[in-house]
Design a protein with these regions (language model features):
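Glycine- and acidic-residue-biased ligand/ion/polar-headgroup-sensing regions
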Residues: 48-61, 65-66
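Short acidic-glycine-tyrosine-enriched beta hairpin
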Residues: 66-84
């Protein structure tokens, strides 16, 4: 297996914080997510990939199929394909997450966001 890596990963800014792709190869991608204090990701699911999240600094909640699970340092969670999930950082410090994607199609557009009902 030949994996792609760069000397300095590119930071991609989002409204909730940022991410960097650290390493990728056939069937997997490793990213660092940083969720800003008092911020959250959208409620989302993916058709072509599973994800594993491990907290390496800070803490956050993960909403999985309407169940809140608290993640702290060295705690992780597996998110299977087609599972609704949302990362929520209610703390005053950034939450750093190592996210591992596994699947056949590993693109940013493999995402379905829950529609907000007002």
């Amino acid at each position: 297996m030949i994996a792609k890596s760069s000397n300095k990963p590119t930071k991609v800014k989002r409204t909730w914080g940022h991410y960097k792709v650290l390493y990728e190869g056939k069937g997997f991608k490793v990213k660092e997510l940083v969720i800003n204090p008092k911020s959250s990701l959208s409620n989302q699911k993916h058709k072509h990939r599973s994800e594993t999240w491990n907290i390496v600094k800070g803490e956050c909640f993960v909403l999985i199929n309407n169940e809140h699970i608290q993640l702290t340092i060295d705690k992780g969670i597996f998110i299977s394909v087609n599972t609704w999930h949302k990362g929520i950082n209610n703390s005053d410090k950034p939450a750093h997450i190592i996210e591992i994607w596994r699947g056949d199609i590993l693109t940013e557009d493999d995402i379905e966001r829950a529609k907000l009902i007002m």
